[in-house]
Every structure is written in C-alpha cells, then in structure tokens.
C-alpha cells in the first residue's frame, strides 16, 4: 500500500440475504476507494444506495462478500480495529450517566488507569465545549450538545480514522454549520483521517478535501470531486464562488441517480 494511503477498499461487494419471500439485495459495489492519510472525505448519494453499508464495511461492522478492506496495511475483518472511531446519527449517549461518565464509559470498560481517563476526558470535553457540563445529564443538553458528547466519547479513544454516519442529520441548519466548524477544528488539530456520510451536498462541499458521489443501488462511485480548499477553512467558505460550482457538479451527478432510486421497484432498502 502506498504510504499516503491510510485505508483501502478494493473490489468490495456487499449483498444482504433475502428476507421472507424476497430476493437478496446487492447493496454495494464492486467498489474501490483509497483514503489518504489525514484527508477529509465525504460520501453523498441517493437514499438506499449503500453509503452506510460502505461505512460499516470499512469500520469492521460488516464483512464484505467480495473484495478486501485494509487499514494501516492490516486487514479489517470482524471487529472494529484499534485506531478507528465511529459516530452515528442516533443519540448514543446513556441517559442515566453524566456527561463525564458517558465520555469515560469506553475507557473504563477497557481497564484504563483512572488518571489517564481523567486526562483524556477532560481534554475531549474541553475541546468540544462541554467542560462546563461535565456533571449534567444528556436530557439537560441541546441536540447539538448531545452530538458533541457522542463525538467526545469517540475522541477519547484517539482515533486515527474517524467514521461519521450523518452525525448532524437531526440538527437545524444553523447548528449544522457551527458543528461543521467544530468538526473541521477537530480534524485539523488531531490530524485524523475523516470519512463523513451525509445527504447534505453543501455540508460535503464545505467540509471535504474530496467528495465521492455514489450511484443508486448497488452503490459505486460515479465521481470523485476534489474541492481544492485550504486546510484552514470554516463555514464562511460557502460564500466562495467555487463553492457553488462544487455543489452544482455534485448535484448534476446525483440528480439522475436520486430519480432512479425513487423509481426503484425493489422493496428492500440498504442503508
């Protein structure tokens, strides 16, 4: 593997078995993708095209039926590898635990020393703007704050590859923009490689070094769009003329695929 390639999908196919009286669902591929070390890569595509399936396969949550997945030159198979962190759209916080205890939960289960846990959790909560809410409970937080907590809980594991499955999907537009700025700050300061699944073309265009546009099911990449943004960027970039050109290119590819997806007669939807 080339030294700048952090993770690779090669010839990956994923097929879901048939349900009662149905047919197997060819959800993904064959698909090839190289994620470069330290890049921010977003994936857009029509509903049901296999975006989340791609993330599951890359993160070790689901095995490919064909092809191979590697992370840092090691095969990904069966379990989430050390060094990969995953954040989902759903609020995964534990309502009976404080913000601090939510962030510390995984580290405690792993048997980490108390002093190291405190140092990591304090840093993550401070970084995500939650230091003043360490003893609060999730029900006392806004939607955006709860999602920052979920990111903090992943951040304490110090992931080198961060996989995000529509983490801001349930938030309003203003909060999404602010959370996007927080995510860019996190990406710059940690140096992690990031893969983001999103339905929002503007979000993908703003945050990413590259955007992959997927086809209707079975999902493959139809276009890989290089944004050309500087590493130091924030949501103000949406006023740049190039931003409109990028989103227009994404939509020109995605529109016909979305119509195909809407008109599909298949009854089973892959994520």
Over which residues does each language-model region extend?
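Conserved signature/switch motifs of ABC ATPase nucleotide-binding domains
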Residues: 136-139, 157
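Helix-to-loop junction immediately C-terminal to a conserved catalytic motif
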Residues: 59
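The feature captures the beta-strand-to-loop junction immediately N-terminal to the Walker
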Residues: 44-46
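Conserved ABC ATPase "signature" region
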Residues: 108, 115-133, 185
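Hydrophobic anchor residue at the start of the ABC signature
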Residues: 151
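Short coil-to-helix segment of the ABC ATPase nucleotide-binding domain corresponding to the Q-loop/switch region
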Residues: 97-105
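Catalytic Walker B motif of ABC-type/P-loop ATPase nucleotide-binding domains
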Residues: 162-165
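Conserved ABC transporter NBD signature motif
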Residues: 67-79
């Amino acid at each position: 593997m080339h030294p700048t390639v952090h993770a690779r999908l090669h010839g990956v196919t994923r097929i879901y078995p048939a349900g009662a009286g149905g047919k197997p669902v060819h959800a993904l591929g064959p698909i090839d993708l190289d994620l470069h070390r330290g890049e921010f890569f977003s994936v857009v595509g029509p509903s049901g095209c296999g975006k989340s399936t791609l993330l599951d396969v890359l993160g070790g949550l689901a095995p490919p039926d064909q092809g191979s997945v590697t992370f840092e030159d090691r095969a990904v198979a069966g379990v989430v590898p050390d060094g990969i962190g995953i954040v989902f759209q759903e609020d995964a916080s534990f309502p009976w635990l404080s913000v601090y205890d939510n962030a510390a939960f995984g580290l405690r289960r792993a048997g980490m020393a108390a002093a190291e846990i405190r140092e990591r959790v304090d840093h993550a909560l401070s970084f995500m703007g939650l230091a003043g809410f360490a003893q609060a409970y999730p029900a006392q937080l806004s939607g955006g704050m709860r999602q920052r907590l979920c990111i903090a809980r992943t951040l304490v594991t110090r992931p080198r590859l961060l996989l995000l499955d529509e983490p801001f999907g349930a938030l309003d537009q203003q909060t999404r923009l602010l959370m996007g700025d927080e995510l860019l700050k996190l990406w710059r300061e940690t140096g992690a490689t990031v893969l983001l699944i999103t339905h929002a073309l503007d979000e993908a265009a703003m945050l990413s070094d590259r955007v992959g546009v997927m086809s209707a099911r079975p999902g493959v990449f139809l276009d890989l769009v290089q944004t050309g943004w500087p590493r130091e960027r924030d949501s103000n970039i949406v006023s740049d003329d190039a931003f409109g050109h990028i989103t227009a290119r994404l939509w020109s590819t995605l529109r016909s695929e979305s119509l195909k997806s809407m008109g599909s007669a298949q009854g089973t939807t892959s994520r």
